[in-house]
Amino acid sequence: MKVTYLGHACVNIDIDGTHFLVDPFISPNPLASHIDINSIKADYILITHAHGDHIADVGAIAKRTGAQLITNPEILAHYEKLGLTGHAMNLGGSHRFVDGKVKIKMIKAEHSSSFPDGSYGGNPAGFLIDYNDDIIYISGDTALHYDMKIIPHQYKVNLAIFPIGNNYTMGVRDALTAARFVEVNNVLGVHYDTFPVIKIDKEAAKRKFKDDHRRLHLLEIGASLDLKDLNISTL
């Protein structure tokens, strides 16, 4: 499972050649101006919620690639009216994709969800992606919440993808607590530095995780990490 960071909260997860694109917000993001959205591969597009900074490029990429959307019923209904197709899920539900090889579970996020025009975007969510018992937890935009402690009772998460920019979501301190709740040692930070209000001190953030014997990965936009290269034990 190879994870490529495409800026803000967008990642592209390559699972043996099948691409799961998450929350594409690339073309409006000046920090990602070097990323060509016309070259992005996508078989599925996961949408955590309806805010504009998570859906800006959904239509363009899905129309070009034929990607299936995976999201809540309200967001899927919105895009079906625009001619796109996909699979609707709701909180607590799971479904298998790619001929049953990839299991995705939709889980709780504490946030809001409305489209840029103010229309209802359903419940915000996160996703657990399970492939051969390698598991990535994408929290989506969220506050720290105690339900995260349920996750390690059922799953051994290899990598968590957490927002760390504060103001709209968890900041670094809460993301570290979330890592403790989930019992995960490797965290990929997202949703930071895109706007002035969510700028962070990256070195201080990494030190905070290191002091807790965990690793915070802050990738350059366009860079990747592979689960097989991570040390899943205590760092």
Task: Describe every region a protein language model picked out.
Residues 1-19, 26-29, 101-103, 204-212, ...:
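Zn-dependent metallo-beta-lactamase
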